[in-house]
Amino acid sequence: MPLADARRRPRGHRPHARSVPLLAAACALALALAGCAVGGGGAPEAPSRGDGAADIPDFSENRLQPLEGTGEPELPVTVDSVVLDPYRTSSDPLGYEQVEVDDVSRILPLTGSLAEIVFTLGLGDNVVGRDVAATFEEASGLPVISEGHEVSAESVLALEPTVILADTQTGPSEAVEQIQRSGVPVVIVEEAWSIDEMYPRFERVAEALGVPDDGAALSERTRAQMAEVREEADGSGDGPLVAFLYLRGTAGVYLLGGEGSGADAVLAETGARDAGVEMGLTTPFTPITTEALIAAQPDVLLVMTQGLESVGGVDGLVEIPGVAQTPAGAARAVVDFEDGVLLNFGPRTPQVVAALADELAAFQAEGEGR
């Protein structure tokens, strides 16, 4: 797994159920996001088209919250699409080309996050296939045609899409080029690595599908939901010290998240501190060493569910050298999130942040009670 490119991160592959404590935290989340401001007329009104916080699904239901009042696509549109360059490094600027989209009757998003955006924009009925990371209920009946950004051109073209959505990690490049040569419009958008970067992504997807106003409305609604989450979360930065571990035990992959992992942005929203960032790790992922893990002394370990299962659950995790010698390992303080959700930076990110904040607060209260 290459670590040289500081803008690449590992991705999860298959959906798994979250732990029971996290689901309980998610139930509290729905109430937090649905709550209205208390007090007199000083609270701003929610945006009319971006409204709908009261209808947010319980996170444990694994459903999306579609926008209300979405419009019909206005086509054709000509949009910018990233040019995939296998030789580009993280410091090189992206190149763009123009792509015309004139039919969105058969949409094929090649990542879970892009699928979430399309469904939330009200165009889910037009989607003909999904990436394995599109684990939400509305997409469950669709055929899986890509896994962890690895696509098969034959599988994609067999679905006869009229437009394909991808991002800068979609590959292999040979497959993408084969799809592009077929004549099907392929719109490639930038990845989102932080909260702020996800809003332009919403709008880029909406523009490509001929519904730019709905993209703006989705950004507006998600910003409002994030503001509510921040009010509920402890944003002081004095929260627990959390180490994000990317684990694939069957492949011998054990990585510690640092700056740019995506988890650092989510943790910052909860008020927690990222152990890798505090250690000075300036790349998204670094191989775990016993000494570094012990020196980090995290209070909580954050992992993806499939990764946790790949090392034998919590029992296997604490057997990894150095883990048991940390406060998190000694207390078995482990939070696991479904692979296709934690780092998606999509319409459900406010739910992710709120659920994680609740879970970390529970661990912190438990630790202070000892």
Predicted features along the sequence, with ranges:
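Short, solvent-exposed loop/turn elements at domain surfaces
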Residues: 86-89, 97-98, 115-120, 135-139, ...
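His/Asp/Glu-enriched short active-site or ligand-binding loop at hydrolase and phosphoryl-transfer sites
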Residues: 257-284
